[in-house]
């Protein structure tokens, strides 16, 4: 109550921010008349003036009002488009490490030119990041004339470019590209073997379009560069044949009754669990097929890999649905993004799940991969000196942007008032009733000439609606992952009179739906159109536009609520752009995923009490509130999972930064001779300490062991025992010096043989290759540690603290191994000439060519397990004495109930 009163008196934080920025907009507007009088050359010369001022000590904030005024004037001359005041506000927000929420159609692309130009003046590089190659190319080509008019260069960074093309793109003042490509280039640069192979400059300023999609929806998706591991496709195929024999549990276990079945599904957590009966059945099936020894358990240590394959196959069959979670195209399983409805070629689920889905669908099973380098988008983007983003829907996730990335969200007002009508949800009992009402609504819109955009949550649902419309003879276009090639064309004409477009989630995001259709695309389709043709197209469009506005504008029709309110708002935001007329409504049924899992009991009870009949819908604020609360619960849970992922990845990120920094130092150094000498001394002293303990008597020395180790691991034959027998004055310290001296002389003789420059180059190549190999093994060990760390909760230990402690120990071991392995190779290898080093480089390049780029979804289940385990750490452990009691045996307490439903619950 007091909060509302204070907001009324002093305005919200957002209002105060906009008010202070509004004063700067007034300054920019005051410059407009003067800048209009400048010639083109005088306007262009402003860029070099600004750069000189920055070099002489002025800041970007000092030149910002003038720079923004210059961009506005240049845009008027190049594009015949003037930045609105609200776009100036958006530009200032983006320059100040914040997120600008700007409604669809408010000109985010043009707004981005302001901070991109300002930060491009520094010469350090600006990265404008979009969600796909099409948008990156489109925005770069559209804005190139403006930036080049002002003397700034523009680059495009998309997949498939050569090394020099990438370098040129990154050396431009402003580089457009996709989040994946920038991330992969960062990883590749940190796997390079010479400075010439690196393409990126230091990460300076990132401006992210559709920031919610990249920093939130993609946050659980690490970028992974991987190489092929062992082939286990046959095992996946065999395990796949077992799953159809298993039956889903008919109901959940209760105290009174145990549900019949082999596995249970937790839809909220998207997890599947085998029951005791299911485990026994799988063991019998595996034994029959000769994959498990008679009497052996699936849960024994030796069968962990088998259990992993069974769990992956069970998840593939029960939790992942064709045409919802993935599609099969060209004998390949392609993931469908649950947030955008787009396909994601090249992206694979981790932990064997993708191979299990391939086995289920009977397509070619690709090998599992071994991680060579990985990073999450969260940690990649936090490396930029300046980070900003823009989207139409950020306010619902403002807390997460602030908490994870330190980015405040500012809601930018629309240039014209928003007049879209958002109708209350209509809730039906069954999907059939819901779809019948949707078809009826569409027919009503077509009669009025009102265009309709139907938003669905899956490909399956979009195809079902398409079939229903075909039956009713309603002309329509379908926009889903299967038809993404025509995406821009379909979206461009979705605003025509009476048009009906079905779109999965937010496919087509980034392209505006213009009422009456997109006349620009009609002109672009003509080759060398005349002025008369252009005028006619525009006049025809104006008539259609007025007809659509009179019919009520674009009508948004949602067929199901998404887990996130933000995705629903994105769908609604397609209508009502730039003050246009429009409307929206969601149609729901009690069998929709969100309703069934979260909101079902309350709303179903209410509907039954109201005595609803078939075809009747409920429309009430209470229902909308219950649905919104359900969405909030899911959003909170997903935020916790992303936060957990980040906390674990932060540990790996600290180590990644150390390794990459050391790697770059090695690569940039002309010679690493001093480093090798220091490592040699460390290795020798450590080795001697193992066999000749300090300040110990000679009887405790293991001289034969030391001689053998030196010969086997380092190729050095030293007659240490002979020295001791013939030279009575040798003691521990002098012996240590003799060993080091002999080692150094042996190494110097190599240098004399092949030449100093060749050996220096070879040292660097060995050091880098050894570091890469050990880092790869370390990443695999970290993955292994991560997957089972939540089980530490059962031992009353905090999994996060245990992960930090053990990962640090693994890292220390890796650094020790690095020293020993490098010295071992340098001591044993005989370098003949420069050609040996070149051959080593060539082999490494051939290996690089086999490397794959993967994006793998982090398994949320492991993180959920970690949360549960932390809670367990607070409980006292139960120690069993005597014989183990089976879960289905009678409880020893004498109650007559099964042990798992009585005292077994406590364990």
Swiss-Prot record:
Residues 897-907 have a biased composition (Basic residues). Coiled coil: none annotated. The keyword Transmembrane helix does not apply. Transmembrane segments: none annotated. SMART domains: SecA_DEAD, SecA_PP_bind. Keywords: ATP-binding, Cell inner membrane, Cell membrane, Cytoplasm, Membrane, Metal-binding, Nucleotide-binding, Protein transport, Translocase, Translocation, Transport, Zinc. May bind 1 zinc ion per subunit. Zn(2+) binds at residues 891, 893, 902-903. GO terms for molecular function: ATP binding; metal ion binding; protein-exporting ATPase activity. Its EC number is 7.4.2.8. It holds the Pfam family P-loop_SecA. It is an enzyme of class 7 (translocase). Monomer and homodimer. Part of the essential Sec protein translocation apparatus which comprises SecA, SecYEG and auxiliary proteins SecDF-YajC and YidC. PANTHER family: CHLOROPLAST PROTEIN-TRANSPORTING ATPASE, SECA INNER MEMBRANE COMPONENT OF SEC PROTEIN SECRETION SYSTEM. This is Protein translocase subunit SecA. It comes from Shewanella woodyi (strain ATCC 51908 / MS32). The gene is secA.
């Amino acid at each position: 109550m007091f909060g509302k009163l204070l907001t009324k008196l002093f305005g919200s934080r957002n209002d105060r921010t906009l008010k202070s920025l509004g004063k700067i907009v007034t300054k920019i507007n005051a410059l407009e008349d003067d800048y209009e009088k400048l010639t083109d050359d005088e306007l262009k010369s402003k860029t070099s003036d600004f750069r000189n001022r920055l070099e002489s000590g002025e800041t970007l904030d000092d030149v910002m009002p003038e720079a923004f005024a210059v961009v506005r004037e240049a845009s008027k001359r190049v594009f015949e488009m003037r930045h609105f005041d609200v776009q100036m506000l958006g530009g200032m927000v983006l320059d100040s490490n914040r997120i600008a929420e700007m409604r669809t159609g408010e000109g985010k692309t043009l707004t981005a030119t302001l901070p991109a130009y300002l930060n491009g003046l520094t010469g350090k590089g600006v990265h404008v990041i979009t969600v796909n190659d099409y948008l990156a190319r489109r925005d770069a080509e559209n804005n190139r004339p403006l930036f080049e008019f002002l003397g700034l260069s523009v680059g495009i960074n998309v997949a498939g470019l050569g090394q020099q093309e990438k370098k040129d793109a990154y050396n431009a003042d402003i580089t457009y590209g996709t989040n994946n490509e920038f991330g992969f280039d960062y990883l590749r640069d940190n796997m390079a073997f010479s400075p010439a192979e690196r393409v990126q400059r230091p990460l300076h300023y990132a401006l992210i379009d559709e920031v919610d999609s990249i920093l939130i929806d993609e946050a659980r998706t690490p970028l992974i560069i991987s190489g092929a591991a062992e082939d286990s496709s046959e095992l996946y195929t065999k395990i796949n044949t077992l799953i159809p024999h298993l039956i889903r549990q008919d109901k959940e276990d209760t105290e009174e009754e145990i549900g019949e079945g082999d596995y249970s599904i937790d839809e909220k957590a998207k997890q599947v669990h085998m029951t005791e009966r299911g485990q026994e059945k799988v063991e019998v099936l595996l034994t029959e097929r000769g994959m498990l020894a008679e009497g052996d358990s699936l849960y024994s240590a030796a069968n962990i890999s088998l259990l992993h394959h069974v769990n992956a196959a069970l998840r593939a069959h029960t939790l992942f649905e064709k045409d919802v979670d993935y599609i099969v195209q060209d004998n390949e399983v392609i993931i469908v993004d649950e947030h955008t409805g787009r396909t994601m070629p090249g992206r694979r689920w981790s932990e064997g799940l993708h191979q299990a889905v391939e086995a289920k669908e009977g397509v070619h099973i690709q090998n599992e991969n071994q991680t060579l380098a990985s990073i999450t988008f969260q940690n990649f983007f936090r490396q930029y000196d300046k980070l900003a983003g823009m989207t139409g829907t950020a306010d619902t996730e403002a807390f997460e942007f602030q908490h994870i990335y330190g980015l405040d969200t500012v809601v930018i007002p629309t240039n014209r008032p928003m007049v879209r009508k958002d109708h209350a949800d209509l809730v039906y009992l069954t999907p059939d009733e819901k779809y019948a009402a949707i078809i009826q609504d569409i027919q009503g819109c077509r009669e009025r000439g009102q265009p309709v955009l139907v938003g669905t949550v899956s490909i399956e649902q979009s195809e079902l609606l398409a079939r229903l419309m075909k039956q009713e003879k309603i002309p329509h276009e379908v926009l889903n992952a299967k038809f993404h090639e025509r995406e821009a064309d379909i979206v461009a004409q979705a605003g025509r009179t009476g048009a009906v477009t079905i779109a999965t989630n937010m496919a087509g995001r980034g392209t505006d739906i213009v009422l009456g259709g997109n006349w620009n695309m009609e002109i672009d389709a003509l080759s060398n159109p005349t002025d008369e043709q252009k005028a006619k197209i525009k006049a025809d469009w104006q008539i259609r536009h007025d007809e659509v506005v009179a019919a009520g504008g674009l009508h948004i029709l949602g067929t199901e609520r998404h887990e996130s309110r933000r995705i629903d708002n994105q769908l609604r935001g397609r209508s009502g752009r730039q003050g246009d007329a429009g409307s929206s409504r969601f149609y729901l049924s009690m069998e929709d995923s969100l309703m069934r899992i979260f909101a079902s009991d309350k709303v179903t009870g209410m509907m039954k009490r109201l005595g609803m009949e078939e075809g009747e819908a409920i429309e009430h604020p209470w229902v909308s509130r219950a649905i919104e609360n359900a969405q909030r619960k899911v959003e909170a849970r997903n935020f916790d999972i992303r936060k957990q992922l980040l906390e674990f990845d932060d540990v790996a990120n600290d180590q990644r930064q150390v390794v990459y920094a050391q790697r770059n130092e090695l690569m940039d150094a002309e010679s690493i001779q001093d480093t090798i000498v220091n490592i040699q001394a460390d290795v020798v002293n450590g080795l001697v300490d193992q066999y000749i303990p300090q300040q110990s008597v000679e009887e405790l020395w293991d001289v034969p062991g030391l001689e053998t180790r030196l010969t086997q691991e380092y190729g050095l034959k030293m007659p240490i025992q002979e020295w001791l027998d013939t030279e009575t004055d040798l003691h521990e310290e002098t012996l240590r010096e003799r060993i080091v001296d002999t080692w150094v002389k042996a190494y110097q003789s190599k240098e004399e043989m092949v030449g100093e420059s060749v050996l220096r180059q070879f040292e660097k190549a060995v050091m880098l290759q050894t570091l890469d190999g050990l880092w790869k093994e370390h990443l695999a060990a970290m993955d292994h540690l991560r997957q089972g760390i939540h089980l530490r909760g059962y031992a009353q230990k905090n999994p996060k603290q245990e992960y930090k402690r053990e990962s640090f120990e693994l890292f220390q071991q890796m650094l020790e191994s690095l020293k020993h392995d490098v010295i071992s190779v340098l001591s044993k290898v005989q370098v003949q000439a420069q050609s040996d080093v070149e051959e080593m480089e060539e082999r490494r390049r051939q290996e690089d060519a086999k490397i794959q780029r993967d994006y793998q979804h982090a398994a949320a289940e492991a993180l959920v397990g970690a949360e549960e385990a932390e809670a367990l750490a607070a409980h006292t452990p139960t120690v069993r004495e005597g014989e183990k009691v089976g879960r289905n045996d009678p409880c020893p307490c004498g109650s007559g109930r099964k042990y798992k439903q009585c005292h077994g619950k406590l364990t």
